[in-house]
């Protein structure tokens, strides 16, 4: 089966690099499925799970926003943060979720509320992806 090369990169360095059969991500415009030979595309990503299919198995990566760049032979995910399902520290993610929930319940200005809301989304995404491994 044809494959496409995928790189998931964060400011801290590469998180994943391999050839896969299909990449599925959630862009701001909706779900995208990328196969080898896909037309060039750049899309902003939501906080969500990237699904990488290879050999009948699916690997999951928690992606905290960023951008997707697609070329016919390569997909690059540039994310602020990304973690493979098996690398997620569930206890740390649960603590981050609880911290964000407490910040949301306290009365704060709009900027802090928005930051707490994003922190909660990131923590919930990490927990969701950790369960998929």
UniProtKB/Swiss-Prot annotation:
Record-level GO cellular component terms: plasma membrane; proton-transporting ATP synthase complex
Keywords recorded for this protein, A-Z: ATP synthesis, Cell membrane, CF(1), Hydrogen ion transport, Ion transport, Membrane, Transport
Membrane topology: Peripheral membrane protein
Disulfide bonds, paired cysteine numbers: none
Cellular compartment(s): Cell membrane
CDD domains assigned to the protein according to its UniProt record, in alphabetical order: F1-ATPase_delta (cd12152)
InterPro entries named in the record: ATP_F1_dsu/esu_C_sf, ATP_synth_F1_dsu/esu, ATP_synth_F1_dsu/esu_N, ATP_synth_F1_esu_C, ATPsynth_dsu/esu_N
MF-aspect GO terms: ATP binding; proton-transporting ATP synthase activity, rotational mechanism
Function: Produces ATP from ADP in the presence of a proton gradient across the membrane.
Family, per entry: Belongs to the ATPase epsilon chain family.
Oligomer and partners: F-type ATPases have 2 components, CF(1) - the catalytic core - and CF(0) - the membrane proton channel. CF(1) has five subunits: alpha(3), beta(3), gamma(1), delta(1), epsilon(1). CF(0) has three main subunits: a, b and c.
Official protein name in the record: ATP synthase epsilon chain
């Amino acid at each position: 089966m044809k494959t496409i090369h995928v790189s998931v990169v964060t400011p801290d360095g590469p998180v994943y690099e391999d050839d896969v059969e299909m990449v599925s991500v959630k862009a701001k415009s909706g779900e995208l499925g990328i196969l080898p030979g896909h037309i060039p595309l750049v899309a902003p990503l939501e906080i969500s799970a990237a699904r990488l299919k290879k050999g009948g198995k699916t690997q999951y990566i928690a992606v905290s926003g960023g951008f997707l760049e697609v070329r016919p032979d390569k997909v690059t995910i540039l994310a602020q943060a990304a973690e493979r399902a098996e690398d997620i520290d569930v206890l740390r993610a649960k603590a981050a979720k609880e911290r964000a929930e407490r910040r949301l319940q306290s009365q704060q200005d709009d900027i802090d509320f928005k930051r707490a809301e994003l922190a909660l989304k990131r923590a919930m995404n990490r927990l969701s992806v950790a369960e998929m491994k």
